[in-house]
Amino acid sequence: MTEVATVKAATPHNTKGDLFSSFNVEDFEIPRGRDEEWRFISLRRLRGLHNGEFAPATTSDVTVEIPADAESASHEVVAKDDARLGRAGAPVDRVAAQAWTSKEQGNVVTFAKNSHNPTPVTITVTGKGEGVTSFGAISIEVEAGADAIVALRYVGSGTHADNVEFIVGDNARLTVITDTHWNDDAVHLSNQLAQLGRDATLRHTVATFGGEVVRIVPRVRFTAPGGDAEMLGVYFADDGQYFEQRLLVDHAVPNCRSNVLYKGALQGDKNSDKPDARTCWVGDVLIRSNAHGTDTYEANRSLVLTEGARADAIPNLEIETGQIVGAGHAATVGRFDDEHVFYLQARGIPAEEARRLIVRGFFNEVINKVPVDSIREELDNRVSSELAVLGM
């Protein structure tokens, strides 16, 4: 007997930049494993975030540290319906909409017009542990002419989903480092939406080393000419870990620039009973018909260090106009280049040290772009700690 399933028709859209969006979780179908947006992740590992069967909801634990040399930075805990939340756009998937619907409050960090804030403001989200599910919303606004650095850190254990938005005003500059430094039993799904004004600059870095399942979905929208977005990422997955990065850069106006570079590594232990390490990177860049003068490039590189680990990489570039400066994309998944190891060995460097140098050099292309010395050093140390597991 053939079983026929009745499926609600998808909301029509022309491009990935026009996906159906809503703040109401009930407007989304429950994801299925064969859905394009969810086909790589194991829905069983999401602890009910995707279908509403999660542990009791609770407010997220958020602390904000503003340094003394910040010229004009403020933090407010606001009501869930505060008008400053959600300005960058509505969720485009059910988990993000669940986080929006279930949150009890939000956090708003504002950098005033023309202010100079050279030291990072640190936002720390701490997991609430077992038996509950935390939901949150964070809005970071850099007003016109201001510059700011934000370190967004996730630590501890638990199940967490949130919406984070970045409003970057005209001639403003924001550098943000998202560091998912969870314990290895955490599950975290995050939507991160950025809205850039005229001649605005965003430097967005995601570092993913901790957590059991971590899915980060950054989306960038240019609203006026002259915008510049650099999207960087580093990740290192071990047995039992699944990391997914799924991003979109939407060039909807003329004369904007974007550069995307993510690098990751995976390793495992043949004696482990945990699932093999797995990562997924999906990078979408959309150049709309009126986005003349666009200059964009995206790349993902993954190193598989042991048998069994798996990395998926899918770059997508959609171009609706030929009047651009340049556009390109690339993705590679590979192992050590033995020729590089032999080259270093020929110069007296032992094989294990040679491999360590190659991997650290691989990551340094991204890590060295982080403008905060302490964060850059911490990320480099984490790579070294991961390699120590392999005896490198």
Predicted regions and their residues:
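N-terminal amphipathic, basic helical "cap/leader" segment at the start of enzyme domains
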Residues: M1-T101, Q105-N107, A112-K113, N117, ...
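Conserved beta-strand/loop scaffold segments within soluble protein domains that form the structured core
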Residues: G86-I349, F363, I367-M392
